[in-house]
A protein has these predicted regions:
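Glycine-rich, acidic/polar active-site loops that bind/position phosphate-bearing ligands
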Residues: 2-443
Length: 443
């Protein structure tokens, strides 16, 4: 990542580069990006005091009678937007949302993540993340019409969108975001860009930045990019496999050279925590009705709560690309999808893992056989449970979770559940094309 900037640095750069507008970015509870722009004349005051706005119109924020909010920009996140004109550049900063008295707003997803990160930092740990965001390119946002027929790792002529990935990576690099690699994914018109691991809060900001960058570069090229988890029937959906580790100083707290899996006792309890709380945090990591169309057997998406080293049918995997190398030791949580709110999703992952560490959860034996090939009896014998099969089931699990309420705080916990109940009711009562085509001719 690029070097962090102070308010003084930002003011100087804006003046020297003749910046025309500075966008202030934050998200609602669902992770939908919100933005407003200020002119350079307002910048100094905005950096010191923040900018007021009406929070009652933002999903999951305040009620109308308590709507005054302050967006306080984080100068460390200042970057130019590469898709804007170079002669009158536009920059952006992520914001923390504050109450009028300057205290953090409990409904701010970024604050939720910062709070759990601070708790972990007090114990001497730094949380690192490396998400793999998959997505699709379509001709437009009205119908999922593919633009290529490539498959996994295909090159041209089957992969005809390499230029889109390339231009996206160039834009990300201009913003100081490091990319490890990119490639065509399994489904037609599906792609992946893997971000180089980074500290937790920066990575949450980066994940949101990447989503916007992918969409902007696609728009400039006359196509549409979507992070919808399952836009095509009969094809793989898009996941956000999230690699994560905890470091204490320069030492990887997940690494133990003497262990047969090269995992420390802490790492094992962390994995056990992720597994124990996977069902109750699914509403956050997989928050849409459509998310559960991806989490079905047969499409390489994890359905079952288990862990392994090389087995990709499990929910948690310990990558073995560089076995025995301390810095590379990490876990990969495979069930989240890229349409989540990164702040909340990363927060609940960390909270679940640390709950396992704090209470010394015991990790079961790894499952190294293909779980999809096991029958129900075999899975029961192995102690393998499954993730929720629908948004409704995920709602039921989260509603009774003390850990999720504690991690998210009462405000976001209640707002998210209320929003998702409405979504489920709308879906449940909707008469779909499936019903019309299958039932109308015969009933």
């Amino acid at each position: 990542m690029s070097e962090s900037k102070t308010p003084k640095d930002v003011i100087k750069i804006v003046k020297e580069r003749n910046v025309s507008f500075i966008q202030f970015w934050f998200t609602d509870v669902l992770g939908i990006l919100k933005s407003f722009s200020i002119t350079p004349s307002e910048l100094e005051e905005a950096l010191s005091e923040g900018m007021g706005f009406d929070g009652s119109s933002v999903e999951g924020f305040a009620r109308i009678e308590e709507s005054d909010m302050i967006a306080k920009p984080d100068p460390a996140t200042f970057q130019f937007l590469p898709w804007r004109p170079k002669d009158r550049p536009v920059a952006r900063m992520f914001c923390d949302i504050l109450e009028p008295d300057g205290t953090p707003y409990v409904g701010d997803p970024r604050y939720v993540f910062k709070r759990i990160l601070a708790k972990v930092a007090e114990q001497g740990y730094t949380y690192y993340l490396g998400p793999e965001l998959e997505y699709f390119y379509f001709e437009n946002n009205e119908t999922p019409k593919i633009i290529d027929k490539g498959g996994y790792f295909d090159a041209p002529p089957l992969d005809t969108a390499g230029h889109l990935r390339r231009d996206t990576i160039f834009a990300l690099q201009e913003m100081g975001i490091q990319v490890e690699y990119s490639h065509h994914e399994v489904a037609p018109s599906q792609h992946e860009i893997d971000l180089r691991y980074d500290e937790g809060l920066r990575m949450a900001d980066t994940a949101l930045t990447m989503r916007i960058t992918v969409k902007e570069i696609a728009r400039q090229n006359g196509v549409y990019a979507t992070f919808m988890p399952k836009p095509l029937f009969g094809e793989n959906g898009s996941g956000m496999h999230t690699h994560q580790s905890l470091f204490k100083g320069d030492a990887n707290a997940f690494y133990d050279a003497s262990d047969q899996y090269h995992l420390s006792a802490m790492a094992k309890s962390y994995i056990a925590g992720i597994m124990a709380h996977a069902r109750e945090m699914a509403l956050v990591t997989n928050q849409w009705v459509n998310s559960y169309k991806r989490l079905v057997p047969g499409y390489e998406a994890p359905v079952y709560v288990a862990w392994a080293r090389r087995n990709r049918s499990t929910m948690v995997r310990v990558p073995m690309y560089k076995p025995g190398k301390e810095k590379a030791t990490r876990i990969e949580f495979r069930s989240p999808d890229p349409a989540c709110n990164p702040y909340l999703a990363f927060a609940v992952m960390l909270a679940a893992g640390m709950k396992g560490v704090e209470e010394n959860y015991q990790l079961p034996e790894p499952i190294e056989e293909d779980i999809y090939e096991m029958d129900e009896i075999a899975r029961e014998r192995a102690g393998i449970t499954s993730l929720p099969g629908s948004l409704y089931e995920a709602l039921q699990e989260m509603e009774k979770s003390e850990l999720m309420r504690e991690t998210l705080g009462d405000h976001i916990f209640n707002k998210l559940i209320a929003n998702k109940k409405i979504e489920w009711d709308r879906y449940r009562t909707h008469v779909s094309e499936f019903e019309i085509s299958n039932y109308l001719p015969i009933l």
